[in-house]
């Protein structure tokens, strides 16, 4: 899905026109969110966001995976597997599954941590525990009430914030903000920007801790791409954020090709990218998530195959994040 431009502008005639639908959608979503969920039997940390689209949940999940392992935990990620055909529950096997089976994000994460995909999230809990999960990390699912969360960590892109702060379809919010704030345990702002700080102020005013983090590119990949004119393409929630990160790393972006989030690349898409790269003598670069969806696709000219631009999340104050996680795990196990 490609987000409408008016979602990220001050309230417009489009958002006003869609307000009645938003009120209905928001009321139903808020009522569903208030339903009780099952107890997983192990602590559950949910990494979610207030709005549809990307905000940096996947790198946050991977950063928390490393933090939890440093505390002696055995995390297992639980994902709905958006874009995959398998309903699950199934343990993702990178050697046997493709993005069309389990979704691009679960497949990408499975290279680093055990990942269970289950369209009905509650059904995936047993499989996660069978693989010795001491903690379940939910990738998304904040608005899904089926599993009780012991820590709900909300991720917001500092540069984008919440757009026009209207509920879908008038804006990007999944439900009205007040019920979401009530269920938020902490906020993580990724990157810098006034839009993110506005969200941080509101969450802090509600008495919830606010953390900050930055996405750091792989230095080796940056060095290998330096000095090469690039054609950058991305099918993620916010392609422009990817393009900005490339430029912020000092790389020369000659052309950009944004695609909708989770875009299933066709042979025509690949041919168009290769033709442009050949014609303009550009190297292709994309995100790790997009490269996962392209895995197994043939390239007539292997030297033109795209290179991934991996990023990792670094907490500004890892000690504070670690302390919150430890307290929440302890409280969950004591209850």
Swiss-Prot record:
This chain is encoded by the gene named lpxK
InterPro entries in the record: LpxK (IPR003758), P-loop_NTPase (IPR027417)
Q: Which domain of life is it from?
A: Bacteria
ATP-binding is among the record's keywords: yes
This entry carries the following GO cellular component terms, namely:
plasma membrane
Task: Give the EC number(s) under which this enzyme is classified.
Answer: 2.7.1.130
| Name of this chain's protein | Tetraacyldisaccharide 4'-kinase
Catalytic activity as recorded in UniProt: a lipid A disaccharide + ATP = a lipid IVA + ADP + H(+)
Q: What pathway does the annotation place this protein in? A: Glycolipid biosynthesis; lipid IV(A) biosynthesis; lipid IV(A) from (3R)-3-hydroxytetradecanoyl-[acyl-carrier-protein] and UDP-N-acetyl-alpha-D-glucosamine: step 6/6
Gene Ontology molecular function, alphabetical: ATP binding; tetraacyldisaccharide 4'-kinase activity
Origin organism lineage = Bacteria, Pseudomonadati, Pseudomonadota, Alphaproteobacteria, Hyphomicrobiales
